[in-house]
Regions:
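Long, charged/polar, surface-exposed segments that mediate recognition or autoinhibition
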Residues: 103-134
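Intrinsically disordered, low-structural-confidence terminal and linker regions
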Residues: 1-32
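Interaction-mediating elements
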Residues: 17-24, 35, 39, 73-77, ...
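Exposed beta-strand-loop-beta-strand "reactive/processing" segments of non-cytosolic proteins
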Residues: 47-98
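Short intrinsically disordered, low-complexity segments
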Residues: 10-16, 40, 59, 79, ...
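Short, non-transmembrane alpha-helical segments in secretory-pathway proteins
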Residues: 24-66, 122-134
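Residue-identity detector for threonine
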Residues: 12-16, 29, 34, 47-50, ...
Length: 134
């Protein structure tokens, strides 16, 4: 699957229209994010309780950007932070939407130093307010 293909999202009947990426440092498109999620789903890394606190572009090497010429192929990789809201487990996955594959996946150990966890989800703000006021 190419990031420029139209992708049907599994939870809706909407099909995205791809926006052409013309430079390695272009912002992520909705089609790329949707394609990345589809790749993670195909790799069985997403459940109904999985949320994505962060989806970030992985910038290409400086040399690739400096040597880029219009029309050159563009490798697009995304870093997804996955949070299972049912279990609290967290992971990071690097997805190549160009190659249509998960390049790397690792569980995050939030119980050992250097302690950390994914950022708050928007859905958690109201819940945090309720807890604080209780």
């Amino acid at each position: 699957m190419s990031p420029h293909d139209a992708v049907a999202h599994a939870h809706t009947s909407t099909t995205t229209s791809p926006v052409a990426v013309s430079h390695p440092l272009d912002a992520l498109t909705a089609a790329e994010i949707t394609a990345g999620r589809a790749i993670l789903e195909a790799a069985e890394l997403v459940t109904e309780t999985t949320r994505f606190p962060n989806v970030l572009p992985i910038e290409p090497e400086r040399e690739a950007v400096a040597g880029f010429r219009e029309g050159d192929p563009i490798e697009r990789r995304l870093l997804f932070v996955l949070l299972d809201t049912a279990t609290g487990r967290s992971a990071e996955a690097i997805v190549s939407v160009t190659a249509g594959e998960v390049v790397d996946h690792r569980e995050l150990n939030t119980a050992e130093a250097p302690y950390g966890q994914p950022q708050y989800l928007f859905e958690e703000y109201a819940r945090a307010e309720e807890i604080a006021k209780a």
